[in-house]
Swiss-Prot record:
Keyword Nucleus included in the entry's annotation: yes
One annotated GO biological process: 3'-UTR-mediated mRNA stabilization
Signal peptide residue numbers: none
Swiss-Prot/TrEMBL keywords: Nucleus
One Gene Ontology CC term in the entry: nucleolus
Species this chain originates from: Mus musculus
Protein name in the entry: Ribosome biogenesis inhibitor MINAS-60
Classification lineage: Eukaryota, Metazoa, Chordata, Craniata, Vertebrata
Feature: compositional bias, Basic residues: 109-130
Amino acid sequence: MKDEVVVVTGLAAMEPLIVHRMIVERTAAGTMIIETWTTAHTHESMAVRRASMSMTTHLKSKVQRIPTRPPRAPRLSVGGGGGTGTVPLARQASPETATIGTRTIGPSKGRRRRRRMRRRRRRRPVTSSC
């Protein structure tokens, strides 16, 4: 059985992020590394770095097999696009805010209020002063 093992090193702030990928073959006799290759992404974006960090959980010396599985839907829908979260659609409010039961996750109330005010202000015609 062949596995692809991905080891990510260089997760400190400005270290280049290096991904070592190894094809590991598991037989009855034991495990054997068939080939390794390295892809170096210098100064990868923090998002990628954070993702890989949570993926490998401080991989410095350990080798951990990261199963290649399709990304699951995010737990909460992130603004726009409507019900992308795992919330049943019946309970979902506007696409802007994902509602779980009664708890709303989304833009803060302040921002919403501000937007409402702006909308109200725009509608009134400007009276010319002359």
